[in-house]
Amino acid sequence: MPHVDLNPLKQRMQAARAAAVAQFRQHPRPDMLLTELRRIVDQALRELVKLCPLPAGATLAAVGGYGRGELYPHSDVDLLILLPQPPSAADARAVEALVAALWDLGLEPGHSVRTLEDCEREARGDITVETALLESRWLAGSRTLMKRLDSAMQARLDAAVFFQAKRVEMQQRHARYQDTPYALEPNCKESPGGLRDLQVILWMARAAGFGHSWREVAQAGLLTSSEARDLRRAEQAFKRLRIELHLLTGRREDRVLFDLQPGLAAVYGIASTATRRASELLMQRYYWAARLVTQLNVILVQNIEERLFPRPDSDARLIDDDFRNLRERLDIVREDGFERNPTLLLRAFLVMQQHPELIGMSARTLRAIWHSRHRIDAQFRRNPVNRKLFLQILQQPRGIVHELRRMTMLNILPRYLPVFRRIVGQMQHDLFHVYTVDQHTLAVVRNLRRFTMPEHAQEYPLASQLIAGLDRHWLLYVAALFHDIAKGRGGDHSELGAREVRRFAQDHGLDPADAELVEFLVRHHLLMSAVAQKRDLSDPQVVRDFAAQVGDERRLAALYLLTVADIRGTSPRVWNAWKGKLLEDLFRLALAALGGAHADAHTVLTERKDEAARLTRLAGLRDDAREAFWNQLDIAYFLRHDASEIAWHTRHLYYQVAPDEPVVRVRPTEHGEGLQVMVYTRDAPDLFVTTCGYFDAKSLSVQDARVHTTRHGWALDSFIVLAPEGFADLRAQATLVEHELAERLRDPHAARHAHAPRRLPHSHARRSRVFPVMPQAELSPDERSQSWRLSVTATDRPGLLYALARVFAEHGVDLIMAKIMTLGERVEDVFIVSGSALERPRSQMQFERAILDALAGDEPRQQAA
C-alpha cells in the first residue's frame, strides 16, 4: 500500500479538539464537549477510510461509550471492524493498514475485527461485549451489514436474562471497589455511585423497553420527575469531573487521586476555609452525589426487577397495620403512609431489626422514605415518641449497624441528627483515617457490636468479657455516634462533641449517670490511646494519674471498649497487636489502681523482682546465679521492664555480665505479631543510631524502645519491632536478626555504608506528599525534672527514627525511652531523653531545630542515610 500522509488530517483533528476544549473552558457543559469530540473523531475516521479503505463489504462501527455518542478527551476510541466473511489475506492487510493509521492519528483505538457470527458468539459468552455491541453506531462502509448486526443483537436480546447478567456484573464491580462510594481515591467511572452505575440503569431500562433517557424512564413510571432530575444532575456532575480529570492529567485518568484533588478544587473554584481543605470540600460534594446515585440505583434496579418478574401481591403477609412482608422485603401498606404518619420513618428501621426474615425494603418503601425524608423537621425531633424510637433502634439485639447504614444512605439519620449531617462524606486528610467521618463512625459502632457477638469472642477476649458485664452497653453506640461529630468545625472536636452528646442525652431522657458516662467518653475518647502509646506505663504515677482522671471501673471498661473500637475503625493499617497489648496493660494497671492497689515504686520494685526471680527458678537458675548480673542493674531498670522481660534478660546474661562481643537475643512477642529484641554490649555514642539503622534497612518498624546503661557501663537496650506485612515466619526472622544485628554492632562503621533506607508504598508516599503533617517538636522537663520529654509529630517516612537517632547522637543527647505511635502515615512519638545540651538554652534551641529539620526530611544527608 502506498504511503499516506496523515499529517494534514491529524492537524485538523487536533485543532478542532483544542477548539472544543477551549469552548468547554468558557462554558463547561459536559454533553456539548463529549458530543463535539465524538463528531470530530467521526469526521476524521470517515476521511481516514477514504485514504485507507475498508475491506470490500465491511463496516466500521463505533461501540461502547463512543458508540453511545460520548467521547472523553483522552478515552480510547472503541471501534468494531465488521467483516461480511472471514478475512482473506488482502482483507487482513487492509485492516492492518487501517489500524496502523488510527495509531498514527493519535487516536489510541480499542478495536476488534469480527464477522457477524463472531459478534453473536462473543455476545453470548460475555455480557460486557453484548452491551458494547448494543450501543454500536455506523461510521463508514456497508450500512446493510450494520443493519444485520443491529437486527441480530436485538433478536437475541432477552430483557430478563440481560437484567440478571448486568446486575451480577454490577455486584462484582462493586465488590472490587469494597462496595462503597466513599473510597479515598474513588474512580468516578467505575466506583459504586459513579458513572457506570448510571449507565447500567439505562442499559437495563433500554433492554426492557422502558426508554433510552432519564425522561423516557420517568415516563415509563420507573422514576419520578424529581428523581430523573436528580440523576441527570449527578450524571452531568460526574461527566464534568471525568472530563476535568482527563484535561488535568493529559491522559485517560478516571481516579480522583490525592495529588489531583487540590487541582480539581481549584478548577471548580472551591477555596479552603479556616477549618477545611478545599480538597475535603470537593470530595464531600463527590460523596454526596455518589450517595444519591447509590440510593436511587437500589430503587430503580428493584423497580425494573418487579416489572420484569411480576408476582402477585396476594402472598404478602401483614406485619402490623402499617407494614407487610412482601417477598421477604418490608413493604409499606399505604403508599402515603410516611406522609400521613412521619413517625413511621423511624419505625420502619425498628421493624427491619425485629423481623430477621426480611432481607431488605421494597422499592416502593425505599422511594416513599426517600420522598418523605423532609418530614423529619424540628417538630419531629422534639416528639417524645420519635426520641424513644431512636433509642430503641440502638437498644435492639440485632441489626443496629445495618439499619444505621441504611438510615444514613436514605438521609434519615442525618436529618434526625442534624449534627451528623455535617460529617456525612467529610474526608479526613490526616494520613491515618481511610474513611469519611460518617463511615468511620459507623465502623466504630460495628466494632462495638462485634464485641457483643459470641462468634467474635476469640478475637477480642477482654473486650467481649467487658461488654458482657457492662450495664446498658448500648450507651457505647451513643458515644460512638458522637465521638467525632464535631470534626471539621475547628477547635477541640472532643470538647465540642461532648457538648453535643450532653444535649442529646438531655433531649432523649437519659438518666444523669448515663448522660455523664457518654459525655465523659466523647470528651476523653483519645485519652486512653494517648496514655497507652505515649507514656511510660511502668511509672506508677502515670497509672495513678490516668486512673484518677477516669474515676471508676464502669468508665474504665467503657473507655477501653470505645478506644479499641475507634482505633480499629480508623484504618486496617493503624491497629496492631502491640497497640492492643499496650491498651490491655493500661486497662489492667488502672483497674488495680481503681480497686485500691495504689502501689508505690518500692512495692512495685519488690513485687517485680520476686516474680522475675520465680520465673528464673522455673528456667532452672539458682538464686545465686543471677546475683552478679542483677547487682549491675539499678532501680530504673526494674521499674521499666516487666518480670517476664527481666527473667528473659537474666537467662541470657547471668553468665556473661561483661562480654567481649555484642549479645543480641530475639524472640517473637507474646501477641505473635512482632519481635522483642535485646541488645547487650559495651555502651557507645552511636549504638542507638546503628541499631535503628539496621531495623530501618530491614523494614522492621520500631514500636517501643527502652535504653538502659548498667552500673558497669554496658548498654542493655530493649526493642519491640513489627515485621514487614506478610512476613509469617517470625522465628526465622528472629534468628536472622540475632545474627545480622550482632554482626552490624561489631562493625558499626561498615553498617553506615551498607544502610539503604526502604521506601514507602507509592500510594502512601503520594498521600503524604499531598497532605503532609506539619512537623512539630515539643521539649519539656518530665514530671520530676529528672529527664526531658520530647514529643514529635510528623509525616511518617522510612528512616525517620534513624534520622532522629542521628540528631540525638550529634547533640550528645541520651535516649532513655522511646514510645512510637504510628497512625497510618502520621507519627506521634515520645522520647524520654537526657543530656547536658538540654540544660543550656542555646544548645537546647539548636537541638530542637535539628529535630524539626529531621522531621521535615531536611537533615544533612550523610552516607549512612
Curated annotation (Swiss-Prot):
InterPro entries: ACT-like_dom_sf, ACT_dom, HD/PDEase_dom, HD_domain, NT_sf, PII_UdlTrfase/GS_AdlTrfase, Polymerase_NTP_transf_dom, UTase/UR. Keywords: Hydrolase, Magnesium, Multifunctional enzyme, Nucleotidyltransferase, Repeat, Transferase. Residues 676-762, 789-865 form the ACT domain. Uridylyltransferase (UTase) activity is inhibited by glutamine, while glutamine activates uridylyl-removing (UR) activity. Its EC number is 2.7.7.59, 3.1.4.-. The gene is glnD. Signal peptide: none annotated. NCBIfam families: PRK03059.1, UTase_glnD. Residues 751-767 have a biased composition (Basic residues). HAMAP family: PII_uridylyl_transf. One of its GO terms (biological process) is regulation of nitrogen utilization. Residues 1-318 are annotated as: Uridylyltransferase. Pfam families: ACT (PF01842), GlnD_UR_UTase (PF08335), HD (PF01966), NTP_transf_2 (PF01909). Gene3D superfamilies: 3.30.70.260, Hypothetical protein af1432. Modifies, by uridylylation and deuridylylation, the PII regulatory proteins (GlnB and homologs), in response to the nitrogen status of the cell that GlnD senses through the glutamine level. Under low glutamine levels, catalyzes the conversion of the PII proteins and UTP to PII-UMP and PPi, while under higher glutamine levels, GlnD hydrolyzes PII-UMP to PII and UMP (deuridylylation). Thus, controls uridylylation state and activity of the PII proteins, and plays an important role in the regulation of nitrogen assimilation and metabolism. The lineage of its organism: Bacteria, Pseudomonadati, Pseudomonadota, Betaproteobacteria, Burkholderiales. It catalyses: [protein-PII]-L-tyrosine + UTP = [protein-PII]-uridylyl-L-tyrosine + diphosphate; [protein-PII]-uridylyl-L-tyrosine + H2O = [protein-PII]-L-tyrosine + UMP + H(+). GO terms for molecular function: [protein-PII] uridylyltransferase activity; phosphoric diester hydrolase activity. Residues 747-767 are annotated as: Disordered. Its cofactor is Mg(2+). Belongs to the GlnD family. Residues 319-675 are annotated as: Uridylyl-removing. Has four distinct domains: an N-terminal nucleotidyltransferase (NT) domain responsible for UTase activity, a central HD domain that encodes UR activity, and two C-terminal ACT domains that seem to have a role in glutamine sensing. This is Bifunctional uridylyltransferase/uridylyl-removing enzyme. Residues 437-559 form the HD domain. CDD domains: ACT_ACR-UUR-like_2 (cd04899), ACT_UUR-like_1 (cd04900), HDc (cd00077), NT_GlnE_GlnD_like (cd05401).
